[in-house]
Amino acid sequence: MLHTLPKLIYTSQLSSLLRARALILTNKLYNVKQSLMATIPKQRVSVIGGGGNVGASTAFALIAKGVPAEVLVVDVVDKAAEGQALDISDASFMMPGTCRKGSFKEAGQSDVIIITAGARQQPGEPRSNLIDRNYKIIKSIMDSLQPIKSSAKILMVSNPVDVLTDIAQKTSGLPRKQVIGSGTYLDSGRLRNVLSEITGVSPTSIHAYMLGEHGDNQFTGWSSARIGGRPLLEHPKMKNVNLDEIYEKIQRKAYVIIDAKGSTYYGIGICAATLAEALLNNTSQVFPVVNYVDSFGCYMSWPAAIGCDGVEQSFDVKLNKEEDKKLQTAIAAIKDACSKYD
């Protein structure tokens, strides 16, 4: 037994040496990465309304996701913007992104401008009144951002997002493809989570969208939904499912959250950050976002590939007769609302 000790000692020493060399190599690679990151000019993302819950959640999500950008928190309430920016910057010391308070003029020269500012709908308030109030807010923001960088992309998050995206495009002067809205991206995520619970399949492997006008006139594209390359509704666990109940659950989700804690912001924050990341990194990923669909003649929550130039392409979606009827209702509602602000 004694004659094996030198071999054991040698093996232990060799193992320690290899671990030490691996650690040195890891540190060198990290330092090289940090050096390379330092030479790459950071892109800028500005969050308008960053002093509020949705804006701050969006800014934090950008940092937490490791997006290598300078994130500016901009708000008419300067103290709120400063507080949120300082708090979020504390989370950036191990991440490639940075965060600070910014001005509207700086925001106008950003690569991506995310708008989360806007008035909330009051109990019993007609939707038309909310649009009127937010029209004035969005127009004021666009005036404050001027001159806007010609290559900038605007991401509208404020509601009613379909109409406000249209207003932002008209008042900013940017091409339609460079102005989009968060639309039904979050609603589609909620849908996929519910379907994942039913089928046992990861939500990332379920392709199903909420479409149309974000809000009352949105609908589920059941006939185009897929799972594993096959129609979703052919999945064995979907045979006896009440589709209307799923739709109602998606529609009620925000109200349940608002009733419990006052407002929603984490979900939409991560969605907005993901869309901004796609715009910055030219990912060409497909999202159900508000984009101008030529065949509809209006902005609409519809699947589109997103890249550094904004909307790269919008897709045709297979609909049945009932779904197409809901689509036409949504188109008419959006066009009617937008026509008042031409």
Q: What does each model-identified segment do?
A:
Residues 47-48, 73:
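Hydrophobic Val/Ile/Leu positions in short beta-strands of Rossmann-like dinucleotide-binding domains
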Residues 126-192:
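Rossmann-like NAD(P)(H) cofactor-binding subdomain of soluble oxidoreductases
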Residues 114:
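N-terminal Rossmann-like NAD(P) cofactor-binding module of classical short-chain dehydrogenase/reductase
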Residues 55-56:
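N-terminal Rossmann-fold NAD(P) dinucleotide-binding loop
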Residues 70, 74-110, 125:
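Conserved N-terminal Rossmann-fold NAD(P) cofactor-binding segment
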Residues 1-30, 34-36:
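N-terminal mitochondrial targeting presequence
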Residues 196-342:
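Long, compositionally biased stretches enriched for glycine and/or charged residues
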Residues 51:
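Conserved glycine-rich cofactor-binding loop
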